[in-house]
Amino acid sequence: MANKNVLSEMDDLMAELGLVETTATPTSDQIKQPQQETAPTYLTYKDPNVSTGPGGDFRNLNDNNGGISRGPGLMSTGPGLVSTGPGLMSTGPGLMSKGPGLPNNSINNNISNNNGGGISSGPGLSFGVSSGVSSGVSSGVSSGVSSGVTLVAQNHLARQPSPPLNSQQQQQQQLPTYLDGVGTLQPISLAATTPDGRVVKANGPICGACGDMIIGVCTNALGRSYHPEHFVCTYCKLPFSGSFIEHEEKLYCENDYLELFSPRCFACIKPIEDTCINALGNRYHPECFSCSGCGDKLRGKPYKEEDGEVYCNTCKIARQKRLAAKSEICSKCKLPITGEYIILQGQPVHSEHYRCEECGCEFNVGKTCHEYEGRLYCYEDYQKQILNICGACSKPIVGRSITALGKVWHPEHFTCTTCQVPFAGSAFREHAGKPYCESHYHQFFGRQCFKCSKPVVDTGVEVFGKIYHREHFTCTGCECVLGKEIMEWDGKPLCFKCFDALPKEVRKRIKEKKAGDKKAEAYREKLAKKEAKELKKERERAAKEKEKESKAK
């Protein structure tokens, strides 16, 4: 009887605190609803004033020794069950939890045994006991004011729990999901902080389409990751049916890629998926490239072009004969004239032949042409043909002139590019199409004597990669003029007398080096001959292939 009074007191106090609702048992729809959320984890906060026993840690908030102690006989609370000793019945069915987001089916329905008694709770359960529980086996509930035990659900996205969500709000939540062991789709939750308050930073691949982080299932392609709903064709926005094609870092299905980027046949205007034929600046399907006369397929056969159409040789000849019988013949190309033509000097010519022989401009209405030596020129090119233009001032030359470097010059304008002094019949040198006097040519482009550092104008002596004036090619030791037989020491020429005066070890090293240089030179010559031989064979092979192609045409 005493136990019943204690239980009823606990129920009354819990109801006053708003911890117990006396509503009916939740429906099956309410129980299924939270299965699509991620169950949060729990933190039990320890305190030095908490006494522990089997089943859990508790916070003692009562200053008058009203805290909860844990004995081996304390029973756990399930849905609607509050027990104080072994074998006690529940005080009333239908206990509802007060925490945020509590799944109604998450409260433990089993009463623990005497040795494992602890308060078990589901996500979001906030449970308070109005009176402290005294120590001892099945001793029941003692008097005194105490806040009891509070178990708080840890929200993975914030330290404070959020208010309960209705069914519509729960459906609007969009969290990454996974399949649990029984095949149920469960949401994946991300912890924002650790139990000790440290910030947890999410880390995942970036979607190549939207740029957001991917949490959950992703699709990898071409070194990028995508949300499954974003791995679609760039053009039609439909998922790929097996394969895709990449173009300029964008993904397309095969049909859209062919429609957007494949070349199109000039004849049928349809995309070319496989082999194509390039002819007359256009592309064709092999089956569409046919003779305009007889319709035969021209793949692998010679053909001729006429007025933008292709013909086989037979149809080409037959067409020319038909046109020649009723058309004029061009006096320039000797071919029939089928369209517009011009009478030039009493002879018909194609209109495309009525143009300047030099610059190719057409003689349109109002533009006159000039004939010179049987050819037609515009006025500007005609003046160039009948007049000599100075290569320096670009003005006509009347009177004396100098012809040099493929141009005609006024005598006073044919000067050194550097000093502007006229050559007046003296010798000059050319570099990059420009004339230079001897001194400035050798100053800028000539080689200098290794000994006196002056340009070598005429012939010099070149040895050891250097050039000398003939009179400056002397022995480094005795300054005598050297002949053909010389020795080298440190890149400098020596006569035999000075060479023999060198130490024996030095002479030995010099001779070994000279022998090595000769051997290397011989090897380089051998390689050069081999390369020249291979180059000759390559040119002969290219000439043969070109000849075969010309015969095929």
From Swiss-Prot:
Gene deletion effect: Cells exhibit an aberrant actin cytoskeleton and numerous F-actin-enriched microspikes. Cells aggregate poorly and aggregates arrest at the mound stage. They exhibit poor adhesion, form weak cell-cell agglomerates in suspension, do not polarize in chemoattractant gradient and move very poorly.
Iron listed as a keyword: no
Gene3D superfamilies recorded: Cysteine Rich Protein
Q: Where is the composition biased (Low complexity)?
A: 99-114
> Segment Disordered: which positions?
43-115, 534-553
Key words of the record: Chemotaxis, Cytoplasm, Cytoskeleton, LIM domain, Metal-binding, Repeat, Zinc
Give the domain of life. Eukaryota
Which part of the chain is the LIM zinc-binding domain? 205-262, 263-322, 328-387, 388-447, 448-505
Subcellular locations according to the entry: Cytoplasm, Cell cortex; Cytoplasm, Cytoskeleton
Q: Which cellular components does GO assign to this protein?
A: cell cortex; cytoskeleton
Q: Which GO terms describe its molecular function?
A: zinc ion binding
Q: Which InterPro entries match?
A: PINCH-1-4-like, Znf_LIM
Q: Which GO terms describe its biological process?
A: aggregation involved in sorocarp development; bleb assembly; cell adhesion; chemotaxis; culmination involved in sorocarp development
The record's function comment reads: Regulates and controls rearrangements of the actin cytoskeleton. Required for tip formation, morphogenesis, cell adhesion and motility, chemotaxis and aggregates formation. May function downstream of paxB.
Q: What is this protein called?
A: LIM domain-containing protein B
Supply the source organism for this entry.
Dictyostelium discoideum
